[in-house]
Curated annotation (Swiss-Prot):
Homology family: Belongs to the hssA/B family.
GO BP: sorocarp development
Signal sequence, renumbered to the chain: none
Compositionally biased spans, kind Gly residues: 62-74
Region (Disordered): 1-23, 62-97
Domain of life: Eukaryota
InterPro entries: HssA/B-related
Recorded name of the encoding gene: hssl32
Official protein name in the record: HssA/B-like protein 32
A Pfam family: Coiled
Biased composition (Basic residues): 75-88
Length: 97
């Protein structure tokens, strides 16, 4: 019984940390892959960055250039990355929706 209660408390703490991580990634799609799309070179999710690869490869988010939102919008950019080095849709717009 003790093991079960510790597992359920750990699972609830993971859920709360996941939601805080999802809210930390500005303009990204919510999910386990989009931990923080602002990690990497360039500015992802602000719509004003000029670096290439605005979203970090480690999180599997969308790799974008020109500051387009990697996961939720940007022009022709739908970021659904898979795996540690997965690239989502490659977008090159400057618009964030």
């Amino acid at each position: 019984m003790t093991l079960f209660s510790s597992i359920s408390s750990m699972s609830s703490s993971m859920t709360s940390s996941k939601s805080s991580l999802a809210s930390f990634g500005i303009g990204t799609s919510m999910g386990s892959n989009s931990i923080a799309c602002s990690v990497g070179s360039g500015s992802c999710g602000s719509g004003s960055g000029s670096g290439s690869g605005g979203c970090g490869d480690l999180t599997g988010g969308a790799k974008s250039s020109g500051g387009s939102c990697g996961g939720k919008g940007g022009s022709h950019n739908h970021g659904h990355g898979h795996g540690p080095h997965g690239h989502g849709g490659k977008g090159s717009g400057g618009s964030c929706s």
